[in-house]
């Protein structure tokens, strides 16, 4: 596993302080053994830890707690790969180079069969979380393939401990301390035009059930009753008919008073 140069000797408190000082990131606190924040209102930027002193103080006092990156307050976004094999199918279908994208940015590794790459968020664009799910061919249950993560969401950062493996999250790919690259234009296009690209990504699923053929419904022929009513209305003036049956017209208006 690739390791971040110069970070192996740092304590968690030192690393978190450096995230704030060097990267200008806003961090959220996560209890030990978890990937989810529990503090009330953790999604609000004002609740996040954003200074080196505050980060060092908190994680010195709570060294076993995990740490998360709050995207909305940090100017960051992430592409989260939950299924590498299926994501490769999508990328190939869209003409994208999966390996080149993974190598172009810092990558968080929690488990060997997954990946998460971080990018700088585009300015003046309000991106939100999006996800593609495919049915598992063995279970039939829907499973997330990949997520586009932005806004009031967080991602666990190294050196937090993964609750399932018991091992620390690590950095791979491009060095995080060199800064984050801009979100690649093709990924941004997919994100911004989600309603156009989502159906394409869903259709790329090799085992997607074929749509059930439903023959077009034949138009119903007009009924005899409808034809009789239309014929009567065409042959008779409505005003003359009402007056014949005793209705009294109100002046020159189209209103009539009942004879009863």
List each model region and its residues.
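Amphipathic alpha-helical segments
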Residues: 93-95, 233-245
